[in-house]
Amino acid sequence: MIRCRDLTVSFGDRTVLDRFSFDVPAAGVTALSGPSGCGKTTLLRVLAGLEKPRSGAVEGIVPRQTALLFQDDRLLPWRTVEQHLTDVLPKSRWGEVPARLALAELEGEEHTFPAALSGGMGRRLALARCLALEAGLYLLDEPFAGVDLPRALRIWERLKALPAPVLLVSHEPAILSAADTVIELDGPPLRTC
């Protein structure tokens, strides 16, 4: 289990999280929900070690075993769909590429470059690349942005089967209702009562 206790995060004079506490179960999918700008992405960045809280503690995270899907896809325009996966997989695991593409419903796109992908396809590729890391914790920032809902729900079922906990950000009601746990963030400065 991951425990966050009394996290306070500020940027200059602006406090985004104010003594915020919560737990992430050791398995399953936990969703973060709330309006834009309330601290969801900041919270993921703190858990990934990319931002330092001003105060508070995070327990139960092994930094090198954490995978973060950024809010933007960060695809390399000169690399094919397949190469985006082989770039993060050791050569001994390249045989997994077809299954990884199937997970993201990208079969047949192996030799396609990012410029030829739709926004939803690019997002699914970024998600497949993140999941290929086989982490102990997945932090997913809007993993289904631009993905049609029926496809997102199919991929969602595969996320729920992962052996590691997933903490994701979503605004989609159907995704939130399918989560094992939902943490509502209602606006800065976010605080636990």
Question: Language-model segments: what does each one mean?
Answer:
Residues 127:
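Hydrophobic anchor residue at the start of the ABC signature
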Residues 113-121:
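Conserved ABC ATPase signature
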Residues 33-35:
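The feature captures the beta-strand-to-loop junction immediately N-terminal to the Walker
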Residues 94-109:
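Conserved ABC ATPase "signature" region
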Residues 48:
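Helix-to-loop junction immediately C-terminal to a conserved catalytic motif
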Residues 138-142:
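Catalytic Walker B motif of ABC-type/P-loop ATPase nucleotide-binding domains
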Residues 79-96:
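Q-loop/switch helix immediately C-terminal to the Walker
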